[in-house]
């Protein structure tokens, strides 16, 4: 899953270990699956993984949390034979619910009531990375931008920022554990309310060697943030800024909130402040319903002209309940050809 999911998976493992669990892959008593729902393929993979976990571990407690789990119904829970379904802002409760299930409690669904209105921070913590050589540090959750193709706001909820002091303290513990590299992550990192201050505080930690962003929306890359990054010796010269399309008409239909020229100006400004060696990578969606052949060519021309270091290209996937899903869809062969 995404970097936010990876952080949450490690933090859940740490919480279970704190209650006496031992991480392992053979004959587990507890299987925790941190799910994703960004595309229809992600949904299918989650269901497949849950079924496999149950088939291979018939007596284990199977817990599903994360974005796909946020929308699981009781009928789906029964069909997939999941013991615990946990919503996106309640993952800190997993050790408690696992203990209840192991003690003979009933299967359950614990999902946030109105996640798009609740201002709740899921209080997971991590002292050191367990599965990676670099540490992901989640400092933000949720999104309220409602791009027309995106299901994330309905499953991740209202934007919320982790308290600055708490985030810095976790970064200190991680670096003092022997991990010198931190990747700041969130569902929409640019909505963190004190991001420049956070960069300066973490960058000043005595044992930090490398600081990165997972991904940041272009509008959040402003002069205040760029100055903080330029003043941070630990910051690695890389920004991943999702573009999605290089065509203004498609960007408008996507409700991205910027034009291609705006993105180009932000990229140029970032290179002007951080240096021409700045590596800018991006995401490019192909096959959006309003993307005709001319729009696709304009998007390609824009990408070629901007000089990205890396482009992650992926096909549009309709998500039920989003405005784009109600639009007339392109033929699948057209999408795959692009």
Model-derived segments and spans:
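Proteins enriched for Cys/Gly/acidic motifs involved in redox and nucleic-acid/cofactor modification
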Residues: 1-185, 191, 224, 239, ...
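Radical SAM enzyme [4Fe-4S]-AdoMet core and its adjacent flexible, acidic
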Residues: 2, 192-208, 254, 318-338
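Residue-level preference for long, well-ordered alpha-helices that form the structural scaffold
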Residues: 42, 163, 259, 292, ...
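Conserved SAM/AdoMet-binding glycine-rich loop
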Residues: 62-66, 71-72, 175-292
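Contiguous mid-protein beta-loop-alpha structural module that forms a pocket-lining wall or clamp
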Residues: 291, 306-308
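C-terminal accessory region of radical SAM enzymes
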Residues: 264-266, 272-281, 310, 320, ...
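Hydrophobic alpha-helical scaffolding
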Residues: 36, 157-160, 214-216, 256, ...
């Amino acid at each position: 899953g995404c970097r936010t999911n990876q952080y949450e998976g490690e933090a859940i493992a740490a919480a279970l270990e704190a209650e006496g669990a031992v991480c392992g892959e053979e004959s587990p008593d507890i299987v925790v699956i941190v799910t994703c729902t960004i595309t229809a393929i992600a949904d299918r993979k989650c269901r497949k993984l849950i079924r496999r976990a149950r088939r291979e571990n018939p007596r284990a407690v199977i817990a599903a949390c994360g974005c796909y789990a946020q929308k699981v119904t009781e009928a789906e829970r029964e069909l997939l034979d999941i013991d615990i379904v946990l919503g996106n802002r309640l993952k800190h409760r997993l050790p408690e619910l696992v203990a209840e299930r192991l003690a003979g409690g009933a299967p359950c669904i614990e999902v946030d009531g109105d996640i798009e209105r609740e201002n709740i921070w899921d209080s997971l913590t991590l002292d050191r990375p367990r599965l990676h050589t670099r540490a992901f540090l989640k400092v933000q959750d949720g999104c309220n931008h409602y791009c027309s193709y995106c299901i994330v706001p309905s499953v991740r909820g209202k934007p919320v920022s982790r308290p600055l002091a708490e985030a810095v303290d976790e970064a200190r513990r991680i670096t003092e554990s022997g991990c010198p590299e931190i990747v700041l992550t969130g569902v929409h990192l640019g909505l963190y309310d004190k991001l420049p201050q956070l960069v300066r505080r973490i960058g000043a930690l005595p044992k930090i060697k490398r600081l990165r962003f997972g991904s940041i929306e272009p509008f959040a890359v402003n002069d205040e943030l760029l100055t903080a990054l330029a003043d941070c010796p630990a910051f690695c010269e890389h920004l991943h800024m999702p573009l999605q399309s290089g065509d203004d008409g498609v960007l408008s239909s996507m409700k991205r909130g910027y034009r291609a020229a705006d993105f180009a100006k932000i990229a140029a400004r970032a290179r002007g402040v951080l240096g021409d060696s700045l590596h800018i990578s991006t995401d490019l969606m192909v096959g959006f319903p309003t993307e005709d052949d001319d729009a696709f060519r304009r998007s390609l021309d824009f990408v070629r002209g901007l000089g990205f270091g890396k482009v992650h290209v992926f096909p549009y996937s309709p998500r039920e309940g989003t405005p784009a899903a109600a639009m007339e869809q392109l033929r699948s062969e057209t999408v795959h050809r692009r």
